UniProtKB/Swiss-Prot annotation:
Family as reported in the entry's similarity comment: Belongs to the CTP synthase family.
Regulation of its activity: Allosterically activated by GTP, when glutamine is the substrate; GTP has no effect on the reaction when ammonia is the substrate. The allosteric effector GTP functions by stabilizing the protein conformation that binds the tetrahedral intermediate(s) formed during glutamine hydrolysis. Inhibited by the product CTP, via allosteric rather than competitive inhibition.
Regions that span the bilayer: none
The species this protein was found in: Borrelia garinii subsp. bavariensis (strain ATCC BAA-2496 / DSM 23469 / PBi) (Borreliella bavariensis)
Function: Catalyzes the ATP-dependent amination of UTP to CTP with either L-glutamine or ammonia as the source of nitrogen. Regulates intracellular CTP levels through interactions with the four ribonucleotide triphosphates.
Location of the Glutamine amidotransferase type-1 domain: 297-533
Protein name per the record: CTP synthase
Oligomeric form and interacting partners: Homotetramer.
GO molecular function, one term: glutaminase activity
Keyword Ribonucleoprotein (UniProt): no
Residues noted as binding Mg(2+) in the record, renumbered to the chain: 73, 143
Length: 533
């Protein structure tokens, strides 16, 4: 462990889903220029990773360069800190228990009874300090998922309490994100949930140095004094985190409220957040939010439309493009399980994102057909590419029974598998972490739409798939006007397709939304929106 390591711990209270990930990333952004910051997310669920969790239940699965499937908060970490995270930074209780049980079988506990304390907490501590050591970290931002009081989080809370004891209170600060409701009909902010949440944290031996109040409006002086009194913090250590037009306002708001100064004083460090560049981009986003110079309407036709977080990175990609092109992009989720062409007529562009399973397939194909036939700018992602190929095979090449092996039924052989299983996937039965995952090179064909967008013939993008375009059909596709414009480095797997005669009809097997940055938007989203203008 680095001698002068500083640690910021972010916990949540009252309710989940109020933005701990964005809050953690925003605080980290204030320190990124002066310290080597490493974000860590602790999740109490027993899954090894979120790779097999339905996006409707937990939000999108974020894929890293190293192939790790991690919590969606890592998208915020990467975008706010402009770094490439590692899968080891996502500590799940599933990983911890798995490691402990393996150690027990190997006899590493020397015959002792294996218990939650000290063995689980020691394993969590060991993992945290190993990350700090391997990354040569100067500051750790540790976000504990869920809310204080959740049974799943008790051991993580106890672990950070022990860490404070071991490294000294001058090297660690605790930040508690809470919710201050204003019930309808009362028109008054209520501090009691915050008080109870902090008391629960106090019972676990942790006393927050900073309380961040998530609310619809700035806290009144009366509520601020009450929280300060009953939660044992100074009034200036109670920070507003109100609803904003874009999440990129939050680090600027924290900067203006002196969050970096409060934490720097606690940790005895100096920091210069350098917030100017972000402020300029946020200014563009805000001005277009309130008085847009131009509005582009984009339909996202997906099967996980019940939860906005299912496609969080796609929506962030569009925000980044809007900031750089000085316009407002409005994205609307359309459920592909119940879709017809009439839903699409008001949109300037269409995105068909990734997904798994046959549910919602045909609705997505309707959207793709509509975009192709009406020359509507279109971007297909992962499954979106596969379905674009199926639609083209059926409606242009005349292969009416074209389909994917993902829809293969044991009692009904597939006659025209234009999409089939990757060779390396055959024989694999486990679902978790077994796909083609992570960053891989893609070779671009010159004089194509995508080559002109990227300006180079070799790129690195992130993948998450089991199926690919069947090469037996590529010649037929290209004779009918579809171009395979990107391949794997061995030229065996099609990674990008496009239809040159259309304004913008591009589909990729990878996920461009996973590497977008507000300062550098993903190229395919940039191309899509430019075609819509």
């Amino acid at each position: 462990m680095k001698k002068n390591l500083k640690i910021l711990v972010i916990t949540g209270g009252v309710i989940s889903g109020i933005g701990k990930g964005v809050t953690s990333a925003s605080i980290a952004r204030l320190f990124r220029y002066d310290f080597r910051v490493t974000p860590i997310k602790c999740d109490g669920y027993l899954n090894t990773d979120p790779g097999t969790i339905n996006p409707v239940e937990h939000g999108e699965v974020f894929v890293l360069d190293d192939g790790g499937e991690v919590d969606m908060d890592f998208g915020h970490y990467e975008r706010f800190l402009n770094l490439n995270a590692k899968s080891s930074w996502n500590i799940t209780m599933g990983k911890i228990y798995k490691k402990i049980l393996e150690n027990e079988r190997k006899g590493k506990y020397l015959g002792r009874t294996v218990q939650l304390i000290p063995h689980v907490t020691d394993e969590i501590k060991s993992t945290i300090f190993q990350i700090a050591s391997s990354e040569n970290s100067e500051m750790l931002i540790i976000e504990i998922g869920g809310t204080v009081g959740d049974m799943e989080n008790i051991l993580f809370i106890e672990t950070v309490r022990q860490i404070r004891h071991e490294i000294g209170s001058g090297n660690i600060a605790f930040i508690h994100l809470t919710y201050v409701p204003s019930p309808a009909g009362i028109n008054e902010q209520k501090s009691k949930p915050t008080q109870q949440s902090v008391k629960t944290l106090n019972k676990a031996g942790i006393f927050p140095d900073l309380i961040i109040a998530r609310s619809s409006q700035v806290l009144t002086d009366q509520i601020r004094k009450k929280v300060a009194m009953f939660c044992n913090v100074e009034s200036n250590s109670i920070i507003d985190n109100i609803d904003v037009s874009t999440i990129y306002e939050i680090p600027i708001s924290f900067y203006k409220q002196g969050v970096h100064e409060i934490l720097s004083s606690k940790l005895n460090i100096k920091v210069d957040p350098k917030i100017e560049e972000l402020s300029k981009l946020v200014g563009v986003i805000k001005s277009n939010f309130f008085v847009p110079k131009k509005i582009i309407n984009i339909a996202i036709c997906g099967k996980y439309a019940e939860l906005d977080d299912s496609y969080a990175s796609i929506r962030e990609s569009l925000v980044h493009v809007g900031a750089n092109l000085d316009l407002l992009i409005k994205s609307t989720l359309i459920d592909s399980n119940d879709l017809n062409e009439s839903y699409l007529k008001e949109f300037d562009g269409i995105i068909v994102p990734g997904g798994f399973g046959g549910k919602g397939y045909e609705g997505k194909i309707i959207a793709i057909k509509y975009a192709r036939e009406n020359n509507i700018p279109f971007l297909g992602i992962c499954l979106g590419l596969q379905l674009a190929v199926i639609e083209f095979a059926r409606n242009v090449c005349g292969i009416l029974d074209a389909d994917t092996e993902e829809n293969l039924l044991k009692d009904k052989p597939l006659k025209s598998p234009v999409i089939h299983l990757l060779p390396e996937q055959k024989g694999i039965k486990d679902k978790g972490a077994t796909m083609r995952l992570g960053g891989y090179p893609v070779i671009l064909k010159k004089n194509t739409i995508v080559f002109n967008l990227y300006g180079q013939d070799r790129i690195i993008e992130r993948f998450r798939h089991r199926y690919e375009v069947n090469n037996d059909y590529i010649d037929l596709f290209e004779k009918n006007g579809l171009v395979v414009s990107g391949f794997s480095s061995d030229f065996k797997i099609a990674k990008l397709i496009e239809i040159p005669k259309n304004k913008f009809f591009v589909a990729c097997q990878f996920h461009p939304e996973l590497i977008t940055r507000i300062e550098n938007p993903a190229k395919l989203f940039l191309g899509l929106i430019k075609a819509c203008i």
